[in-house]
Regions:
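Alpha-helical scaffold segments that form or flank carboxylate-/histidine-based iron centers
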Residues: 2-15, 37-60, 80-89, 121-140, ...
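Structural signal for well-ordered, non-membrane alpha-helices
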Residues: 17, 21-28, 65-68, 94-101, ...
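Helix-loop segments that flank and shape redox-cofactor active sites
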Residues: 23-51, 67-81
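Conserved alpha-helical segments that form or flank metal/cofactor-binding pockets of metalloenzymes
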Residues: 49-76, 96-104
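A structural boundary/capping signal
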Residues: 71-77, 101-121, 125, 129, ...
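Mid-length scaffold segments of soluble, non-membrane domains
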Residues: 88-95, 104-107
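C-terminal or internal capping secondary-structure element at the end of a domain, subdomain, or sheet
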Residues: 130, 134-174
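Intrinsically disordered, polybasic Lys/Arg-rich low-complexity tracts
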Residues: 173-191
Length: 191
């Protein structure tokens, strides 16, 4: 089985951003239900030297749109990093998803060998497209989505693993009662 660069990127990025949107919705609902100023959660951090929730969302969306654009050879949409509320963060995610949906499989054909050159604080970095996607873009998206999840969970938002995983488009999950665990056999009692 071969997996195309498109299959390994665009649908997976969209899936993760939809999960992030669901996580943020639960954060906003939590704040509303408990009378918490939503800005407290949007500005929350896990530790003082870490980025706040808003910045985690900005970086996750920047990585997603930047990764797809570089692999497709198109201009990266520029979003100012000014979001300060849950609705603004949701809008940023929606704009990123809309951009990702504009990328076609044909645009990513052959991108596994495309040169991707980035200028970072540590200096210039060069990747092949495949290495860039699998070792830079995807781990960064997962990291920042996970950190957003952790910030909200740390602040009491009721989130679970399924919130992070999101609704898997190819999965056939049937809701209902969990399967019963088999009863343990007990050794006969000695008299």
């Amino acid at each position: 089985m071969s997996l195309s660069m498109y299959q390994a990127s665009v649908p997976v990025l969209i899936h993760n951003l939809k999960a992030l949107a669901g996580i943020l919705k639960k954060g906003a609902d939590h704040a509303r239900a408990r009378g918490i100023d939503p800005a407290v959660l949007v500005d929350a951090r896990l530790f003082p030297d870490m980025f706040p929730l808003a910045r985690q969302v900005q970086i996750a969306t920047d990585m997603a749109k930047g990764g797809a654009a570089r692999l497709a050879g198109v201009e990266i949409p520029s979003f100012p990093d000014t979001e300060a509320s849950f609705p603004e963060l949701q809008e940023r995610i929606a704009r990123t998803i809309a951009f990702l949906k504009s990328i076609t499989p044909a645009q990513l054909e052959g991108s596994e060998q495309r040169a991707v050159n980035l200028q970072m604080r540590m200096g210039a970095v060069s990747f092949t497209g495949q290495y860039y996607l699998l070792s830079w873009v995807m781990p960064n998206v997962y990291f920042h989505v996970t950190t957003a999840y952790n910030i909200l969970r740390h602040n009491g938002v009721e989130l679970g693993k399924w919130d992070f995983l999101g609704k898997a488009p190819g999965a056939n999950i049937k809701a209902g009662k969990p399967a019963k665990k088999p009863a343990k056999k007990r050794a006969p009692r000695k008299a």
